[in-house]
Amino acid sequence: MARLTKRQKAIREKIDPAQQYPVAEALGLLRELPGAKFTESVEVAVNLGVDPRKSDQIVRGSTVLPNGTGKTVRVAVFAQGDAAEAAKEAGADIVGMDDLAEQVKGGNLDFDVVVAAPDAMGVVGRLGPILGPRGLMPNPKVGTVTPDVAGAVKNAKAGQVRYRTDKGGIIHCAIGKVDFEVEALQQNLQALITDLQKLKPANSKGVYLKKVAVSTTMGPGLAVDLASLET
């Protein structure tokens, strides 16, 4: 049996993996656990009562976290004319059309989010094999294909997270950094849960919000007592 590291031993002494913690206590414990050598993200996994094999039960969306993610986000925008100018004024890092497409084809993907005006999708669509596997393909369901490119840029810069259920019906996303105050993390988590409730598929039967767990990038997961969330 592998020997536990000092960090693993310290973590085991602080948490009970079988326990469900009130949300504020769970987030507070994450801040107290021995950390890695970098500022870890706080991540959440939400098990939803959906059948991910059915296309009408895939949950996909985006949430603007009230306290941001703690990350600097670079945004690329495919737009022209007035929309391009609006994107630049909103703080987009890269704005273009065919020239930006050539950058992408050349392997220059120095951005975290891609936004596209509807009339740019003819150009963007051809980049699907490059952007798609990297999770960068714009999509109207998460607000990244929109006439309001300026609004999309501002949302991305403000800390918008995008998510989609995986094959197990689970949503994964980061809700901040471990050095955030507990209240800020709790507000971010609650914003996500509130939006997920709004996205409940009409055909979802039984319990929708089944389990919520929080963790740091390199740390263990803590189950959250659902009664401590506003659902």
From Swiss-Prot:
Keyword tRNA-binding: yes
Gene3D superfamilies named among the record's database cross-references: 3.30.190.20, 3.40.50.790
The protein's name in its UniProt record: Large ribosomal subunit protein uL1
CDD domains per record: Ribosomal_L1
InterPro entries: Ribosom_uL1_bac-type (IPR005878), Ribosomal_uL1 (IPR002143), Ribosomal_uL1-like (IPR023674), Ribosomal_uL1/biogenesis (IPR028364), Ribosomal_uL1_3-a/b-sand (IPR016095), Ribosomal_uL1_CS (IPR023673)
Record-level GO cellular component terms: cytosolic large ribosomal subunit
GO biological process: regulation of translation; translation
Sequence similarity: Belongs to the universal ribosomal protein uL1 family.
Residue stretches spanning the membrane: none
Subunit relationships: Part of the 50S ribosomal subunit.
Source organism per UniProt: Alkalilimnicola ehrlichii (strain ATCC BAA-1101 / DSM 17681 / MLHE-1)
SUPFAM superfamilies, alphabetized: Ribosomal protein L1 (SSF56808)
Keyword ATP-binding: no
PROSITE patterns: RIBOSOMAL_L1
GO MF, one example: tRNA binding
Record's keyword terms, sorted: Repressor, Ribonucleoprotein, Ribosomal protein, RNA-binding, rRNA-binding, Translation regulation, tRNA-binding
Function recorded in the entry: Binds directly to 23S rRNA. The L1 stalk is quite mobile in the ribosome, and is involved in E site tRNA release.
